[in-house]
Amino acid sequence: MKVLQEINLTYSILVIADFSSIFGCLLVLIAFKKLKLLRNHITRVIACFCVSSLLKDIISTGLTLSLGPQNEAGSTSFQCYLYAITITYGSLACWLWTLCLAFSIYNLIVKREPEPEKYEKFYHGVCWTIPLICVIVMLAKKTIEPVGNWCWISEKYVGYRFGLFYGPFFAIWIISAVLVGLTSRYTYSVIRNSVSDNKDKHMTYQFKLINYIIVFLLCWVFAIVNRILNGLGYYPTLPNILHTYFSVSHGFFASVTFIYNNPLMWRYWGSKIFLIFAKFGYFVELQRRLDRNKNNNNPSPILNSYAATVYHSSTIESLSLQHNNDISNDNQQQQQQQQTPQQPQQQFQQQQSPTVIEMQNLKQDQNIENNEQNENCYNTIDTNIEINTNKLNDNSFEITQPSNDLNTIENNNNYNNNNNNNNNNSLVIEKEKDEREKKDNKF
């Protein structure tokens, strides 16, 4: 009787997890379809994950309902083979798309890849081919049998379970964790050295970088623990229930994470949900505000974009520091000039020839003009950053190319240095001429 109750409980949890995963993936895919602002490289990777999870969950749900709690499928039936193929192929594909997501984010932020779309064909080749190889090996070795509420690799083939399924899981998760760790380390270094005061929001952004990989681990860690216990001959109830629910509902929790990371998406669905209450007079203002801002590219200190955030944070930081250093240097020069006695300067200017004085005045005019050009470049950079910020989507994950104004400032500085060197050489030549003329006059 206790075993029958456990089977029925596990079956109910399995059905709930299947439907919740289907629901979550549909929410993400519908939002991507409706919101054109979300269509970019990263969202295409997420969409492929959701498609893989959705197809897996639809097929497995149909098989679960048709076989019933007792799993009446025979070990050689078509339904049993289809169930095992669906679980193995669909789960591996979802894991690999998660790895591709981690690599894409790392590639955009740390490596600043200008054309991440060129990797999409490689992603498709890996994510659809590797699961197929594992399925072919599983079928060739005839390892499939009814296992609890579904069909999968028999308990007699523990080596195949870990070699074809949980072994790739460990490899995929470790590589994804390393990529996310490198990305988080890079962004943290930018945030720590940033001049921005919104560090709390920056830490929220930092959490958004790693939450999907945490969900990935939590959803499958119970499955690994349960299978290790099964391999040792133990079949506890609680690990089996946790394994059933979290592994099957991975698509749901991943979809919730994607929606949480993207304000455009939760505004869109929030406006749809509160529209029902607004018809009865509840949450009217909230629904209007969400509907009004669902397509709004709200600029924020973190820009709500993985790649654009890091680029603009580092750019603003470097420009601010450079600009502050220039201002401090100018202030120091002005203070030194004010502290210097004026009478010796006037006497020195009277002793100098008119040509030398004109050259000094020309040098000062050129320095003023060059400073104005640099100031205009800084203003242009600030304007371009503001324009690019307004064009970004919330969590659109698009990267913006660096502005050419940085090169302009560098060229202006090089030009200033060359002019200063030429002016100094001219002053030395003029001084030598004056000294020679004075010596000639003495003789």
Swiss-Prot record:
InterPro entries: GCR1-cAMP_receptor, GPCR_2-like_7TM, GPCR_cAMP
Post-translational modification: C-terminal Ser or Thr residues may be phosphorylated.
Annotated region described as Disordered, given as residue ranges: 325-354, 396-443
Transmembrane helix found in the keyword field: yes
Bilayer topology annotation: Multi-pass membrane protein
Annotated source species: Dictyostelium discoideum (Social amoeba)
Listed name of the protein: Cyclic AMP receptor 4
Residues annotated as glycosylated: 8
Gene, per the UniProt record: carD
Function: Receptor for cAMP. Regulates axial patterning and cellular differentiation during late development. The activity of this receptor is mediated by G proteins.
Highest taxon above the source species: Eukaryota
Lineage of source species: Eukaryota, Amoebozoa, Evosea, Eumycetozoa, Dictyostelia
Positions in the Extracellular compartment: 1-11, 66-89, 141-161, 230-263
Start-end of Low complexity biased regions: 332-352, 411-425
